[in-house]
A protein has these predicted regions:
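Conserved short loop/turn motifs at secondary-structure junctions
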Residues: 1, 36, 156-158
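Conserved acidic, small-residue-rich alpha-beta core segments centered on
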Residues: 165-175
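Short, polar/flexible loop-turn hinges at active-site or ligand-entry regions and domain interfaces
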Residues: 152-159, 178
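Phosphate-handling DNA/RNA-contact segment within nucleic-acid enzymes
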Residues: 3-151, 164-165
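C-terminal or mid-to-C-terminal helical accessory/interaction module adjacent to the motor/catalytic core
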Residues: 177-183
């Protein structure tokens, strides 16, 4: 896999290097004079704002690689860097598509990750969103408060998921707005 192929192709089409770097799609993390594809060898998820506009990306690694001699492991998920358009703390994955269904039933299913939301959507659950990791934030809570009265937390059953469920309940109970269930 050539991690510079996309950059080289866009550069050949006269895209501005500065804009390419600001896009978050590329990184110079490896200390080279050339930009590398940040999401190489990953499944890419477009991250859309509430209006449905793609503002960032997240990539899930396809194959876990063993640690190199520095002990470095690649992260399972890698997001675009935060920008004026994208702040992970303010963001709920799939909110743009789920909002009308959430409002119609005044209920939201809160999942841990993208794959959970996608699987639920394929099974007919159209009111699902993901908190982009294992922690619901106050900012995400404010978004949900404006949209639903009932929240069903469907985080993973592993230890991090259980701890995240406890933290989410603490945040959700502070505003006394939600009827909270755990799935």
């Amino acid at each position: 896999s050539n991690r510079t192929a996309l950059f080289q192709m866009l550069k050949a089409k006269a895209f501005d290097e500065g804009l390419l770097q600001e896009s978050g799609i590329f990184t110079d993390r490896q200390g080279q004079n050339e930009l590398f594809d940040r999401f190489s060898a990953r499944i890419i998820f477009p991250l859309r704002n509430a209006k449905g506009k793609t503002v960032a990306f997240s990539g899930r690694i396809l194959h876990a690689s063993p640690a190199d001699d520095t002990g470095y492991h690649e992260a399972k998920y890698l997001n675009s860097p935060e920008t004026l358009l994208f702040n992970k703390r303010d963001f709920l994955f799939n909110f743009d598509k789920a909002r009308s269904e959430i409002r119609r039933h005044s209920e939201v299913m809160l999942f841990e990750g993208y794959m959970d939301v996608i699987s639920a959507w394929q099974a007919g659950v159209k009111n699902g969103v993901a908190s982009m990791g294992t922690s619901l934030t106050e900012e995400q809570n404010r978004i949900l408060t404006k949209t639903a009265d009932k929240i069903v937390i469907a985080y993973d059953g592993d230890r991090p998921g259980v701890e995240a469920t406890k933290r989410a309940i603490e945040i959700l109970e502070r505003n006394k707005h939600f009827d909270i269930s755990i799935f």
